[in-house]
């Protein structure tokens, strides 16, 4: 069914402006009478952050910025959905055009700049769907003009954590000036101390919510050492590796590769997977990792798992491969478990040391 929908609609959507096509897709998913997916293979179940995921494949933040259609996305077969990025106050983000398809490279460049309707809309929609169940995380970020960005994250934890399965502290978007400076050791330590204190206040009312940190792929290895050390000391529940990159790998063919913004999709895969493995060896199983960046096939998903991800996310590949990719990836992971004769957990991190020994991706 999803394959037929893809074949009928993708040519039309590809003819539209990318941002318009995305908005139309989200609206269609929101209102389409999608059936509930078949139950997942029990071998795909994952326990992480104190939560039980039916399968390891989620949709990354950015697809459903305003929490408009998380239940529709769960019905597509994702094991979890991450909405956002949501900021405290509404902000328009950067001027259009700000989303570019790199068709020749199967990549995407965006410079949205945390375009957000603000916390009020997200809170209302997430509150309304809370009874539906399913794992829905919320990715949060600071307003561009905020005088105290740490206070923005604290406010969002206090407001949105009660209606979220987990909350992601996004300090790695390249499209908000100065945001990535919050990954520096002293700034990150202060931010996480404030965020986790807010989490404890919320926990007294509704129970604890996992707090994850989303990092950039462009960190130097010494900077990654600092990030992991702070995250471990402050006892975050997990790290998402990684956001989009401001670098441009060698060999990009599409003329739009010159656009300013964060690059995602297939060209990000080598760098994102290397950073995932580097993070895994530093974390030493202190907490789980979510691997994201360039997953476009079952083989790519398995490479992320073997590099150290307990859970994985995708987004850009849906533009080029369609909605049928979700079932394809889950089937490929199940086959890999069969062939290995073990469990999904046995695959996690198997290749991390080998990945970190390879030459740095160019």
Question: Language-model features: where?
Answer:
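C-terminal helical cap(s) of enzyme catalytic domains, especially alpha/beta-barrels
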Residues: 90-106, 249-261, 318-342
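Active-site glycine- and acidic-residue-rich loops that bind
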Residues: 142-154, 181, 187, 213-233
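Catalytic cores of alpha/beta
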Residues: 66-73, 154, 219-233, 281-285, ...
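Glycine/Thr-rich beta-alpha phosphate-binding loop at enzyme active sites
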Residues: 26, 30-32, 37-39, 174-187, ...
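A gly/proline- and charged-residue-enriched helix-loop-helix capping module
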Residues: 84-133
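An N-cap/entry alpha-helix motif that binds or orients negatively charged groups
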Residues: 3-46, 110-115, 120
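Glycine-rich phosphate-binding active-site loops on the catalytic face of alpha/beta enzymes
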Residues: 80-91, 171-173, 238-248, 301-330
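Short beta-strand/loop segments at the ligand-binding rim of alpha/beta enzyme cores
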Residues: 51-58, 132-140, 201-219, 281-291
